[in-house]
Structure formats: C-alpha cells, structure tokens
C-alpha cells in the first residue's frame, strides 16, 4: 500500500492514561532521507517505492500523519546500573501506533514529558548505527526490533561536539519492558499492573490469554525467551552495553541499541559502554545480569504470582535454560551435526582457549569454517597460538 493508505491502530491507548502521555513531535530543520528499508516495509505492506515519496521523510519528521496516528510516549521505571529509577519513560521516542502487529516509533523526534532535561534528539551517527545493527541482528536470526528508515537534518545538537540531528523509525512487536511492570509495582497500583499483564499477554503471548494459569505461564515464557536471546547474543559476541531493566523486552527482543559493540579479541571482561566503569554490563556478565533483571521482573509480578513458583523458574534459568540454549547455538556455530554429552565440555574449553589466545572472535570462526586439518591459519590469527593448539 502507499503511505496515504496506512491505517494505524493505537490499542495501548485503551489502557489508563498513566501508562502514557500524548506527545507532539518537534520537526527537524531541512530533513532529508538517509535510508529507507524495503525489507521492513514489507512487514506493514508498505510499497517498496515509498522511500521515493517525499511524504516518507515527512512521516518520520512528524509533519505527515496517516489515518489513526496518535503520537504518545510510554511511561515506565527501571533499575539502572542496579539502582531503581522511579520514573523514566520514552525520553526521545514517540509512538505512532501499530500496523500488522508492528508498533512504529520514532527516536529523536523531540522532547517528551520524560525527556529529563535532555533535548529529545538523536545524532546522525548513532541513528545510522541502530538502523544498521538492528537489521544485521535480524538477518543473523536474533530476535530484534527493526528499522523502517532514518532521516538526517540541518538541526544542530550538542553532544561531545556539535552534531546534526536525525530520526530513526523503529518497529517492534512490543515496546513493553520489564521496567513498565516495575513502575506500577513500586507505585502500588496493582490493578494497573494486572491490566498491563493482560495487555502484554494478548500482545506477545496470545496463546495464553484464556489460560487459568496465564500469569505464571507468561512469566515462564518471558524467562525462556530471555535465556534464548542472551545465548544468541553470546554466540555472536554481541555486547548490549546498557542492560538496565527498562531496556529489557518482555517479548524476548533486542531493543534500545545504544553503546553496543561486537567483540573483536575474545574477552569476557569486554565493556563497550564507557560509563560502565565497574563492568556491570561486560560481555561475560550478560547472562548473569539477565538473571538479575528477571529477578527484578519477578518481584514486580509478585502481587499476581506466587514468588516461590517464580523462583523455581528462575532457578531453571541458571541450571539449564540458559546453559542449554547457549550450548545449542554454539553447537550449530561449530557445525556439529549430532548432540553428544561431551559437547558442553568441548564448547567450555573452546571459549576458555579463545580467552587465552587473544584472538578475534568472528575471524576465528571464519577461519575454523575452512579448517581442513592444516592448523597454521588458526595459529596465525592468535597472539597466543598455544591456547588454540591445546584445544585442537
């Protein structure tokens, strides 16, 4: 369909007004198209030629509103670096509504009521990074938000230097976060907490909506999806950088691409966020932080679900859900055709060898994929080839 035929739904606005605030975007000056994503456009039945339509830039810039668009920003709280922040929300994200189950949201469209002294803008480099990385993650088979397009402008913003502002259009099956539940738990609005849970089930786990035990099963599936997601992150060397509970998706998606990075030399202690001085969100800590975040999520759900039942599910995360998910994806990465009891030991020894070898993570697997018995190509890419030799 063409841009003028888009018809947005805003089911989230059926919730109480404390869940959101209506927001008016602030258009950029002299906005222009940087990139349009025809692959993401197919998800909402938008014609691939829409990137050539000037109204696409206007859509992202907030000056063109198709049928049903009602801009709003979502309210949530969250634990940031382990400390509870009682009111966060979409500081620079503006939701337009949903099409075909995909919620469209602009990032960088101006100040919202949650901006917290920021300008509500996004710089061109960081916007392009998110646009490219979210699409790369999708094509690597990792659950993620998508990006429909990105625009630049002549609007100047102050970061470390003066930069030009951009807006990226993000798409997600859900923008509900762990921190959304925390907000209503800590403000003791348990009726709204229940309404949010019902909404999240219909949105992301519709097969549970008529189940008598739907709240516990909802929590269980969030734990399972999160375990699989983090295992996939670890398998490709993805480091998120800001794993606060407000950046954790209840749908098991990679969301909020900020100071993310990919591993170069394999290093469990790698930290991609310069503000993370203690290494809380280092590459090697991501599985543990996910468990901690799920524990905070379980606390937020405790008015609805027995805490002991949730704790047993959390114990499963550490004992077999995450370890098994990680072994499964690494088994595929190594091209192992059969599941053997020895696989876990083989993979554990491999990552230990990579840590000791000072070797580029991605390059190691590219080289290993061409392994024909000749070891020198693998030795040549390691600063400490003895570690690779001992594993082989």
Predicted regions and their residues:
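Conserved protein-kinase catalytic-loop position immediately C-terminal to the HRD catalytic Asp
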Residues: 246
């Amino acid at each position: 369909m063409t841009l003028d035929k888009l018809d947005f739904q805003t089911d989230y606005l059926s919730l109480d007004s404390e869940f959101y605030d209506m927001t008016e975007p602030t258009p950029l000056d002299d906005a222009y198209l940087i990139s349009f994503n025809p692959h993401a456009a197919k998800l909402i039945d938008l014609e691939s030629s829409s990137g050539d339509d000037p109204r696409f830039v206007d859509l992202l810039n907030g000056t063109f509103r198709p049928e049903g668009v009602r801009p709003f920003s979502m309210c949530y709280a969250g634990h940031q670096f382990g400390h509870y922040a009682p009111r966060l929300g979409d500081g620079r994200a503006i939701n337009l509504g949903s099409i075909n189950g995909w919620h469209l949201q602009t990032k960088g469209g101006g100040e919202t009521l949650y901006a917290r002294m920021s300008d509500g803008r996004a710089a061109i480099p960081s916007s392009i990074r998110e646009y490219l990385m979210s699409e790369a993650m999708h094509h690597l088979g990792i659950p993620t938000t998508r990006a429909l397009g990105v625009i630049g402008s002549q609007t100047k913003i102050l970061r470390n230097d003066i930069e030009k502002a951009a807006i990226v259009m993000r798409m997600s099956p859900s923008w509900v976060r762990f921190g959304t539940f925390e907000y209503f738990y800590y403000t003791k609005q348990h009726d709204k907490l229940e309404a949010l849970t019902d909404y999240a089930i219909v949105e992301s786990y519709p097969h549970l909506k008529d189940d008598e035990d739907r709240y516990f099963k909802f929590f269980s599936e969030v734990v399972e999806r999160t375990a699989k997601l983090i295992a996939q992150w670890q398998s490709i060397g993805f480091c998120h950088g800001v794993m606060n509970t407000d950046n954790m998706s209840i749908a098991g998606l990679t969301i909020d691409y900020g100071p993310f990075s990919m591993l170069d030399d394999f290093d469990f202690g790698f930290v991609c966020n310069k503000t993370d001085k203690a290494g809380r969100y280092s590459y090697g800590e991501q599985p543990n932080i996910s468990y901690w975040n799920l524990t905070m999520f379980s606390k937020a759900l405790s008015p609805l679900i027995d805490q002991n039942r949730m704790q047993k599910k959390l114990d499963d995360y550490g004992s077999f859900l995450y370890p098994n998910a990680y072994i499964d994806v690494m088994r595929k990465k190594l091209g192992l055709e059969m599941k053997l009891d020895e696989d876990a030991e083989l993979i554990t020894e491999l990552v230990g060898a990579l840590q000791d070898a000072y070797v580029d993570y991605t390059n190691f697997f590219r080289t290993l994929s061409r392994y024909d018995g000749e070891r020198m190509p693998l030795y040549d890419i390691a600063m400490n080839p003895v570690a690779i030799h001992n594993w082989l």
